[in-house]
Amino acid sequence: MQLNPAEISDLIKAKIENLSVNAEVSTRGTVISVTDGIVRIHGLSDAMQGEMLEFPGNTLGLAMNLERDSVGAVVLGEYEHIKEGDTVTCTGRILEVPVGRELVGRVVDALGRPIDGKGPINTTLTAPVEKIAPGVIARKSVDQPMQTGLKAIDSMIPVGRGQRELIIGDRQTGKTAVALDAIVNQKGTGVICIYVAIGQKASSIANVVRKLEEHGAMEHTIVVAATASEAAALQYIAPYSGCTMGEFFRDRGEDALIVYDDLSKQAVAYRQISLLLRRPPGREAYPGDVFYLHSRLLERAARVNEHEVEKLTNGEVKGKTGSLTALPIIETQAGDVSAFVPTNVISITDGQIFLETDLFNAGIRPAINAGISVSRVGGAAQTKVIKKLGGGIRLALAQYRELAAFSQFASDLDEATRKQLEHGEVVTELMKQKQFSTLNTAEMALTLWAINNGSYSDVPVAKALAFESEFLSFVRTQHPEVLEAVNASGAMSDESEKTLEAAMKSFKSSYAYQA
């Protein structure tokens, strides 16, 4: 066989000319050490702060410490298979989670992956977990109510849409119960709720999901769970992931409510990560930026104006404001609200609801201390009728507490003081409410109206709650138009008051309420 050298050289030249080599540029590094979920990597000179890194076995990590000759990263999940000498790749992306309506009704982990066994979530949209909060110009003042359905909160410590209201108290004082009531009460209002469980037992989270399902609240709720058994990194990220999911609705001119249960455990997880990364510890061994950890999260809860919504939706949604309301929960130790994390979060939020162990054990539930609980912006958002009728409640309770303290030393009390004490006792009793028995505006207004006009003056304290319940049922059946009118207008007309006065007279004559 004759070989033609010219032919061969032509073939080789043609191959060389047509050769296309697409060079993929990727920064790679080598694992130096792995300890407690923290990986030190050599050679990732181009890594960004907060960038996602890819480890062998499709495991993701987060670049947190950018040092001169190494990068300190935290692994998001299992790290037992990562070993010294493994190759790590930069992804060039900041950590993102899936967002969208498809998440509603589902239970997901801190990275937005479904963990409820109901199959994959079909959403194509993702958003970064870390975002800059809306600026002053993009915001609108809080002037719409976020009804919790709890008499004590809606009358004395009102929450508005776009507000951050802290729920603070010791363990086992009913903090989660208050937050769950607020979520259940949003049924039928169009408000989407996000419940972020941080560092809780998996059994507790399963119980919360079951209760929400029982009360039909999962239809408007997303549950983001980072259990106590998961990596500290996931417990640290979970609140930001939940916030991103809530911002999706806020930026489209809708209203959302997010509960962080609880931020004390997030701070502990962040402290663990920071100490393992050898960052210098400060007060209570927390790192220096623990205030920023919570402030950058809670500042993202806001009410944004129409222009901002229009800009974010590219003109699709016009004339609508969006809001994200936050109810962060903080657990105190033996009622110490002057500890580092509680004082930080109190200073960031727009008010706080203090829950006390003594009140809880005395059977006053929700165990709210009305004296030191405040809402700094909610007053402007309160419904007219509740604002008008609820004004005397806080005063009555304050006077009652003061007189109750003095009456312990006084043997004989004058008639006026005795009446005031009795009134205070009745008000305290009527502020009690069972879990998942939320009231709408009209039902709450009815109770407050009855307190204000002295209808309970001849009702024994022990029978006050039963009297309230029976009277509500009576009005629901005999005068439903009054409740409908109050719910529709948010105010109580003179005509409605006259109808209620007649109804109260008729009810008292037929109901055996006296001891």
From Swiss-Prot:
Cellular localization per UniProt: Cell inner membrane
Record bears the keyword Disulfide bond: no
Residues with site note (Required for activity): S373
Binding site for ATP: G169, D170, R171, Q172, T173, G174, K175, T176
Main function: Produces ATP from ADP in the presence of a proton gradient across the membrane. The alpha chain is a regulatory subunit.
Homology family: Belongs to the ATPase alpha/beta chains family.
Protein name in the entry: ATP synthase subunit alpha
